[in-house]
Amino acid sequence: MIKLLFVGDIVGKPGREMAEERVPRMRRELGLDFVVANGENAAAGAGITGALARSILESGVDAITLGDHVWDQRGWENEIGAMDRVCRPANLPAACPGWDHVIMAARGFKVAVFTVLGRQYMNMKAEDPFRCADLMVERLRGQADAIVVEIHAEATSEKQALGWHLDGRVTAVLGTHTHVPTADACVLPKGTAFMCDVGMTGPYASVLGREVVPVISRFMDGMPKRFCLLYTSRCV
């Protein structure tokens, strides 16, 4: 049996430290063959850098996926092309730099992973995630024994729809972006594993990894606030 761990959005230094401490231990204790992590919030909660990506990979992560914060860190667009274990969303415009998938290999078994961005309530230019996923699955079929699809999206309806759309054609469809895990993990009728959102790796007593008080204040008075990462909570 092949075992794969998918790690939800790594949020800032607290999330990185937890992932880098837990992943090696989980690989040993659970006998994991593959570890995939979403790293798009690794740099202070917004984006990633080459140095941070290398650190996460060196901790035992096999592939890093990204989402709508992919370009938040200045200069990252000049580094991503050299990192073939990091993939940006596949449905970004074709001119964007970087890899649109990663293929991992262990024990004679290959797993392909790619991400698509949702388009509902997402403020980023992206092509149709359904058609893009169709094209990616056709392209990767024959190159890998299993295909894991991440949908980085806001709307649960869009995530569920993609799960049903790909049921029986891929190994798993896993949602990210909201930082809140959903209680709907299941295997769809044709055999595809599905979960709307796997949650985050970051501070527990927070609002999506941020300090609570400024977020509440912003909701109540509508005034601009600085949403800082929370560093004083245990992580999940």
Where are the model-predicted features located?
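Conserved beta-sheet core of the metallophosphoesterase superfamily
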Residues: 34-36, 55-66, 76-88, 156-227
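Extreme N-terminal starter segment of soluble prokaryotic enzymes
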Residues: 1-4
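Core catalytic region of metal-dependent phosphoesterases/phosphodiesterases
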Residues: 7, 19-98
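Acidic/histidine-rich helix-loop elements
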Residues: 11-17, 41-48, 120-128
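Binuclear metal-dependent hydrolase catalytic cores centered on His/Asp/Glu-rich metal-binding motifs
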Residues: 25-26, 99-146
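Catalytic metal-binding/acid-base residues of hydrolase active sites
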Residues: 11, 40-42, 69-71, 91-92, ...
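Short acidic, glycine-rich surface-loop motifs adjacent to enzyme active sites
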Residues: 10, 34-42, 115-119, 137-157
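Conserved small/polar residues in nucleotide/adenosyl-binding loops
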Residues: 231-236
